[in-house]
């Protein structure tokens, strides 16, 4: 209640709602090649989208906490307070003139950029030749200080899985090493179309 009062005094006037999500189950995959296996799963999350207002107008933002274990979720008060601060920080925003300058991306936006990278390095875009990464293995695609690792077996990782949607085991690997593209995300079909081997990514990255 104290946090809510502070947010109201600071300019939070409403919200677009808060959500609590929880699920658990057991996934089983069987196919005509004789593969059958499964694993238990769980996912829990809380989120909120507050609205801030001042003389310049209204702004909204959001924040969330997500984990395989509900005990590892951030406290609801902490999620709400941070979401409120994000909404308040948007008030009074103004446009910049066109310029060239370094840009620092916050974590959620950086994840979105990585999603664009995965899409461009995935089988469908590659065999249709609609990606700028066609035949780009070994070439410099990022700055030398950047490496991207895929680990399907990361303990309690949100995307961890012992196998993909075809029953193929995923690979612990560096997809980008020192800025160079070292691997693609391929299902068996996409791999055949490219004359390569499956990387265990039917259904996407881990």
Model-derived regions, located:
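N-terminal small-residue-enriched
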Residues: 1-206
């Amino acid at each position: 209640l104290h946090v809510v009062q502070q947010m109201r005094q600071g300019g939070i006037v409403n919200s677009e709602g808060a959500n609590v999500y929880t699920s658990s189950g057991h996934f089983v995959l069987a196919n005509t090649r004789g593969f059958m296996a499964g694993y238990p799963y769980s996912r829990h999350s809380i989120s909120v989208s507050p609205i801030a207002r001042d003389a310049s107008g209204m702004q909204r933002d959001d924040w969330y906490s997500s984990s395989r274990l509900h005990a590892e979720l951030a406290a609801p008060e902490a999620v709400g307070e941070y979401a409120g601060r994000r909404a308040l920080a948007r008030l009074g925003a103004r446009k910049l003139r066109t310029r060239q300058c370094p840009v620092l991306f916050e974590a959620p936006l950086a994840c979105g950029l990585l999603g664009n990278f995965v899409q461009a390095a995935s089988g469908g875009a590659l065999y249709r030749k609609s990606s700028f990464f066609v035949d780009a293995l070994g070439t410099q695609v990022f700055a030398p200080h950047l490496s991207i690792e895929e680990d399907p077996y990361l303990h309690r990782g949100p995307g961890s899985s012992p196998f993909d949607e075809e029953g193929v085991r995923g690979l612990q690997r560096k997809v980008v090493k020192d800025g160079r593209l070292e691997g693609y995300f391929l299902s068996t079909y996409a791999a055949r179309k490219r004359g390569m081997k499956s990387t265990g990514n039917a259904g996407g990255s881990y």
